[in-house]
Amino acid sequence: MMVLIERESNFNPNAVNGWDSNAKGGDPSRGLCQVIMATFVWCKHPGAPNDIMNPLANICAAINWIKFKYGDIRFVQQANKNLPPKGY
């Protein structure tokens, strides 16, 4: 997760991506893991704060998304320091 967070937000919990396809579609990536609101709403942990910019809530939503989509973080290129960055 540390590699993914560094690549996605450079450890900035207030990071907002205002230029990619998600932003152009009205749902910018936000927070440490650069989660979009649609994913956050669907994947947030019920015990975590309901705030996409909250570091704990953002990371929990990202982990739930990774588990759903990839099964394991080992299959996420963006989280592998030996591979070039790639969105997840």
Cite the ranges covered by each PLM segment.
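Peptidoglycan cell-wall recognition and remodeling modules
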Residues: 1-88
